[in-house]
Amino acid sequence: QPLIFKAVDSSGSRGIIRIDDLSKCRETIEEVKKYTKKDYFIAEEFLEGEEFGAQAYILGGKVQFILPHGDYVFHGDTGVPIGHWVPFELDEEIINDAKEQLQLAADAMKLNNCAMNADFILVNGKTYVLEIGGRSGATCLSEMVSTYYQFDYYDKMIEAALGENPDFHSNDSVPCAAMLL
């Protein structure tokens, strides 16, 4: 069974290495150490399924919205996102599961009043967390939140940082996509 080794203080797929042969374990550990300032990392089962991402915002300790997005991925040693699109069609049950995972992660990491960027994988109808960070996503994801929901996401993040109570509710949605060339 393949494994994935992950640096815990990196992002953008840096320090994530798949290992198929346990005899290469030591060299893989040394490679992961190049991407971290910590003296530990995560080792987990390699999962195959449908990957998707999500943008979210946590305010007052509660997830205010979750916007699942599809990812355009460059496949090298590991997949690297090079673009995204919304909406990413998922059953409501899967979206609720992803939102619950986001809430649990935010609680565990003590994240509050911040954007959240998440990567998930869907395996046999179950949502697994690949990576979550207390930041807005890259590759035009903040702009896609603004376009999709028809509000200025940057303004909402600034309002929250100033201690205001921004309203993330929207009745409008505009499909959109962005990709690095």
Name each model feature, range by range.
Residues Q1-G15:
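A conserved helix-loop-beta module that forms one wall/lid of the active-site cleft
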Residues G12-S13, G49-E51, P175:
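Short acidic/glycine-enriched loop/turn segments that link adjacent beta-strands
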Residues I16-D21, Y57-L59:
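Short beta-strand-to-turn element immediately C-terminal to the catalytic PLP-Schiff-base lysine
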Residues V32-Y40, E45-F88, D97-N117, I121-Y128, ...:
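Phosphate-binding core of ATP-grasp and ATP-grasp-like enzymes
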